[in-house]
Amino acid sequence: MSQYAPFIKPYIEYNQFGWGPCDMPDMEVPYQPFCKSDRLGKISDWMMPVQEKKYANKYASTFGSNNSQYAYFHEDDDATFHLVDGGNPRALKPYQRNRYRPNQRNNVRVHGRNVRGNAAIGGGQGGAGGTGGAGVGNKYGKGRDMRRGNMGRRFMRNAPVRLRESSVVVRSDWVSIEEIDFPRLLKLSLPNIKDGVDVVTCGTLEYYDKQCDRINVKNERPLQKIDRIINVPGTIDDPIIRRLSKSMGNVFATDDIIATLMCCTRSNYSWDIVIEKLGTKVFLDKRDNAQFDLLTVNETALEPPQDEEGSINSPQSLSLEATLINHNFSQQVLKIGEQEPKHKFDEPNPFEEPGVELASVAYRYKEWQLGDDVVLIARCKHNGVIKSPAGELQFLSIKALNEWDSKAANSVEWRQKLDSQRGAVLASELRNNACKLAKWTVEAVLAGSDQLKLGYVSRVNRKDHLRHVILGMQQFKPQEFATQINLNMDNAWGVLRCLVDIVLKQPDGKYLIMKDPNKPMIRLYDIPDNAFDSDGNDDEETSDDRPFLKSLGN
């Protein structure tokens, strides 16, 4: 007998007519594709009906859940199968109904993070077991969000972002010189800048009507339409600046342009400023037909206005409405009349036109020493004048905040809170209009105004944008108000000086500073001299301003 195990040859089926086995395999056998990396599923899940987005398909097959070709369907109905705890819940006694609410609230906070919108828990269909929007989310979330100014909407991280449009279209022949983000600008500082020195003063001011300080919600006053004109020409179009540029200064601008640059870190909307450099002289100007002079509304709010163009609550309509309100309000609170006293400066209004009634505005052309032979000449303005109890003249900057729809703006109701909680109203406006209030404060500080008068103007009806009423007045000292709103003037001067230094290092030409519409940064472009000549009224600039600029270069 052999000591080795016998080797038996296996049977090998030979298919002489093709490739593969000769016999057909068994049919009608259930088959489900399987991958070793698939997670084992659960028979039942008794957690709250909240689906996590990060692991939404963690129990799905690798081969896809929509592939029904290999799906297995059980056709036999098992009538004896029952869900566990599927009966009617035991009725709770009145003192037991709120026992488990805190745990349920905590679950909402944990799982509600990955839920889109407000419809996952307690939304419009009842959320976790509720009906008609009375679920957990509405009960514990809505009131809290209203108290915090809808801060709870931070969970809407996956909501679609609406991109803002640029104030000017960047063309292909523009050369990008530098990009500066806001964190870098916030670190700048230029301390010990002394108050500006008056170079030229011109215009006429009317006195403030002290009866307006008695206006309140119960004693409101309709806002009137004042048919007066306030001329706000650009830097190069100003005849006084043209005259001064030949003998003093090397940086020229207006107060609104300087305020825009100083407060650029608080802005969200896009804006642009045109710069002309000739030798050592720099002119900061604005484009013709631009919306630079229009005021923004709720620019820094959590939910800025996003209605379509044509609606009374669209950003364009609200901006025009706020600008007209400020114009009418700044004139209505003054003593208007031929017999009323007026304060006249040394020179008349340089923008006076025959047959046109000008508004009560006075202009101060002031000089600042910014160091390193950088001398700033800027045009500032006052809106009114008042006599103090000691008989001294005090110059005023008069502005107006407007309420359009408190519910749509997520703000407080002025008619309910203005008399009793004026601080809450102002805090809400500081949150929603931080950039606009900061620019007003900077303009008042630059002009040397003794008081900043703020008026509260609201619509008669939130659906009527043509009729308004004055609900109250409030006054501040500009320097104190700057401290109150956390406006650092040293940083503001540092931002301006930084931008001026960058431009002074460039060759002569035309440049443009633009705030990025969707990013917290500003960009500096080198643009052609005829970049905006295709606009409607830029022919005047080509024929009038260019010879003036060339004469300065010579």
Swiss-Prot record:
Known Pfam families for this protein? eIF-3_zeta
Annotated Gene Ontology cellular component terms: eukaryotic 43S preinitiation complex; eukaryotic 48S preinitiation complex; eukaryotic translation initiation factor 3 complex
Please list the residue ranges that the record marks as compositionally biased, kind Gly residues: 120-140
Which key words are in the record? Answer: Cytoplasm, Initiation factor, Protein biosynthesis, RNA-binding
Which InterPro entries does UniProt cross-reference here? Answer: eIF3d
A single Gene Ontology biological process assigned to it is: regulation of translational initiation
User: Does the keyword Translocase belong to this entry?
Assistant: no
State the superkingdom: Eukaryota
Q: Any idea where this protein resides?
A: Cytoplasm
- GO MF annotations, alphabetized: mRNA cap binding; translation initiation factor activity
Residue numbers spanned by region RNA gate: 291-305
Disordered: region residues: 116-149, 532-554
Q: Which HAMAP family match?
A: eIF3d
PANTHER family xref list? EUKARYOTIC TRANSLATION INITIATION FACTOR 3 SUBUNIT 7, EUKARYOTIC TRANSLATION INITIATION FACTOR 3 SUBUNIT D
In UniProt terms, what function does this protein have? mRNA cap-binding component of the eukaryotic translation initiation factor 3 (eIF-3) complex, which is involved in protein synthesis of a specialized repertoire of mRNAs and, together with other initiation factors, stimulates binding of mRNA and methionyl-tRNAi to the 40S ribosome. The eIF-3 complex specifically targets and initiates translation of a subset of mRNAs involved in cell proliferation. In the eIF-3 complex, eif3d specifically recognizes and binds the 7-methylguanosine cap of a subset of mRNAs.
Tell me which family the UniProt entry assigns to this protein.
Belongs to the eIF-3 subunit D family.
Q: What is known of its domains?
A: The RNA gate region regulates mRNA cap recognition to prevent promiscuous mRNA-binding before assembly of eif3d into the full eukaryotic translation initiation factor 3 (eIF-3) complex.
- Subunit composition and interactions: Component of the eukaryotic translation initiation factor 3 (eIF-3) complex. The eIF-3 complex interacts with pix.
What is the name attached to this protein's record? Answer: Eukaryotic translation initiation factor 3 subunit D-2
